[in-house]
Amino acid sequence: MVDGEDKIKLIIIVGPTASGKTELAVRLAERFDGEIVNADSMQVYRGMDIGTAKPSPQLRQRVPHHLVDIVTPDVNFSAADFRREAAAAIDDIHSRGKSVFVVGGTGLYIRALLQGLVDSPSGDESIRRELVELAQTVGNEELLRRLALVDPETAERLHPNDRLRIIRALEVYRQTGRPISTFRSEHGFADTYYDCLKIGLRVERQELYRRVESRVEVMIEQGLIAEVEGLLRAGYTPDLKSMRSIGYKEICAYLAGECTLDEAVQLIKRDTRHYAKRQMTWFNKDFEINWVEYPESFATICNHVIEFFA
């Protein structure tokens, strides 16, 4: 067991593509003497810069970024690989007395880091809302006492102030009739070594889609076609997992004469919009995320971080 006071504190910044995560992370890391751990499944690949919207060299000079450019495009980098590499990077950053910011839109990677790789029961919003109201009425101590009656193992690990996890444990029991500790023991999950503040960037849908379309056009202007041509010349074939990602597969099709450039660009825009929608569906299921508007709420976000570190 790791006591709450001994856990490494992580600031986790999530949101859909083109929502401004990287810029926010850099500003916060500069403000709070931190370093960034990338949680984007495509930015790990060397030579795939434009199509992955990788942080610019200028941003990476301002703040150290980890798990960027760590493997070649022919490596099948997995969530398990990410979990291992991210944990090592977090330990390194923490050991040097720096704040840790985990930033990205790959929800599976973030879940792998925090919870392991086996699904726990999905959340039930109505049960969660009822338990939140109960906590406000009876208080955390009583809520923890009630958890101890049905799941003493989990209750023993939790502090009364850890309201979110108490509610989550009660929610799982109400849903399944089983203590959450039985899911943990079945899958061999260890107690997480992290204490997390999750910040999500919310962007109005039409504005997000406008940003997506603008970003795709900028990628073409910056040389996405030449980037893909270079990857193909280097021997990275279109059937690789990395080359089948959004932006690369469409340009590969264009270069193979399977569609026009305009058709490829329209497909990239469409597929990126769909991806952003899937990202929001994923993150909306996480009740621990504090959703904010950015950049309007930067001061509010800073206050959240200050309170978290206090």
UniProtKB/Swiss-Prot annotation:
Species name: Geotalea uraniireducens (strain Rf4)
InterPro entries to which the protein is assigned, alphabetical: Dimethylallyltransferase, IPT, P-loop_NTPase
GO biological process per UniProt: tRNA modification
One Gene Ontology molecular-function label: ATP binding
Site (Interaction with substrate tRNA): 106, 128
Chain sites annotated for binding ATP: 15-22
Keywords assigned by UniProt, alphabetized: ATP-binding, Magnesium, Nucleotide-binding, Transferase, tRNA processing
EC nos: 2.5.1.75
Record protein name field: tRNA dimethylallyltransferase 2
Subunit description: Monomer.
UniProt enzyme class: transferase
Function: Catalyzes the transfer of a dimethylallyl group onto the adenine at position 37 in tRNAs that read codons beginning with uridine, leading to the formation of N6-(dimethylallyl)adenosine (i(6)A).
